């Protein structure tokens, strides 16, 4: 049965920098906290595990190499025991989880998100379609079968996007067309506009993301929009500074940017600069009607006979194989990574749950 009213939470906290195990433990702690608070849904920031590598915007190539090595070593495979522990935490708390993480698949990293159900199943697994600017130093592109965002669940049609994907008009159109009701606008960590230096545009600072892009997404799509953000501490600044470079000393410009918005774009909650934890919201899916009765860009307020979006969800592989019938064999990333398999009952248990 669909649940139309429930409590949800957005995480605004400091990740376990370069620390896969620490990040997993902190993730489970927040899932437990959200579950104890009565939440049906909790949303984490972009690449929460093992933290967003903001240092890549400030380092030279040679400075980046040891940091990249360490970052890759602490990124998480989606079919890993670390991910299964997180999935079990979701199941133990009977809660939906939107998790952003740096995914390692073979030798490439991706800015990935999963939507985990209250049974521990991975409902959706997606990868950011295009890393932003210097993010290409670290991450690869998502493929056709890993970029869809919206999933039908008992708490509504839930969508997820990473960072500047939230201002991509084509991705917004795609999500609107799926009837999205609850959206996770997952953001990383980056400074506020008080740190802006000419000619760097305001686009590249946290305030427009929090106070322009995110509420714009909410009002354009008519969705409850949760915007989890990472934070930084003095120690975090040191960890994210290459050896031999003097670290910044004031982390406050990086903090206080998480938000939650109603479907009409009005603000529900924003944290103080020093707040670290969960932001809560009481969601009523029926409130989406108040906005969508005025403007539903997937229905009465659109003209598909004039404007349409072409979407290609096929995976393009480097190596193709012939199947027994002589045509091209296909497989999905989801199947290859084992996400179609049920979750084991407990850590170390080889048996699986009944489907």
UniProtKB/Swiss-Prot annotation:
Activity dependence on pH, as recorded: Optimum pH is 8.5.
Cystine pairings recorded for this chain: none
GO MF, any single term: cyanide hydratase activity
Record CDD domains: nitrilases_CHs
Keyword Lyase: yes
Induction of its expression: By cyanide.
The entry's keywords: Hydrolase, Lyase
A family per Pfam: CN_hydrolase
Protein origin, superkingdom: Eukaryota
Keyword Hydrolase: yes
Entry EC number(s): 4.2.1.66
GO biological process: cyanide catabolic process
Active site (catalytic residues): 46, 128, 163
Domain CN hydrolase: 6-286
Matching InterPro entries: C-N_Hydrolase, C-N_Hydrolase_sf, CN_hydrolase, Nitrilase/CN_hydratase_CS, Nitrilases_CHs
Reaction(s) the record says it catalyses: formamide = hydrogen cyanide + H2O
Role according to the record: Catalyzes the hydration of cyanide to formamide. Degradation of cyanide may be important for plant pathogenic fungi in infection of cyanogenic plants. Also has low but significant nitrilase activity with acetonitrile, propionitrile and benzonitrile.
Subunit description: Oligomer of dimers, forming left-handed helical fibers.
Family to which this protein belongs: Belongs to the carbon-nitrogen hydrolase superfamily. Nitrilase family.
Protein's name according to its UniProt entry: Cyanide hydratase
Organism: Gibberella baccata (Fusarium lateritium)
Record gene name: chy1
